Amino acid sequence: MAIKGLEQAIDNLSRVRKNAIPAASAMTINRVATTAINQSSSQVARETRVRRKLVKERSRLKRATVKNPQARIKVNRGDLPVIKLGNARVVLSRRRRRKKGQRSSLKGGGSVLVVGNRRIPGAFIQQLKNGRWHVMQRVAGKNRYPIDVVKIPMAVPLTTAFKQNIERIRRERLPKELGYALQHQLRMVIKR
């Protein structure tokens, strides 16, 4: 009793490369890591009201290979200087300007510095000693050098987003993606 297509099946099995499964797993790991970066960046961008591109370029992916099936995501969690948000411009408020000699919290007659989509009262632009331009603001309670660069804190949102999303995506997407990658590897070598 001969099984139909047995020779073809044996031929196909012998044609599957030894590194087909490691290649599929490396491909899967890279896909899952990329998805984690994308979703975490989107979440942080929504929370901090910063463009997704600015958040995404703070994370680097060292891709998994057949020999080393581990992907490493490195994230720059430092604060983001406000000057990176876009064009800075001074907007004059339409409120009644203060009279000469009157004290006001809005100095300069209510002009406010707007950078990207953020209004920063009491801020100004200055070139630092290192040649970079930054948005500066006076800091109360600081005796020496009472001005500081205006920054958006990114450490907490980035950490929480990446921790949540990496675990969730690993649970949900990894088995599915591994199945797709194995099918892809087999499809390349198997003849029907």
Q: What are these language model-derived features?
A:
Residues 1-192:
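Short, Lys/Arg-rich flexible segments
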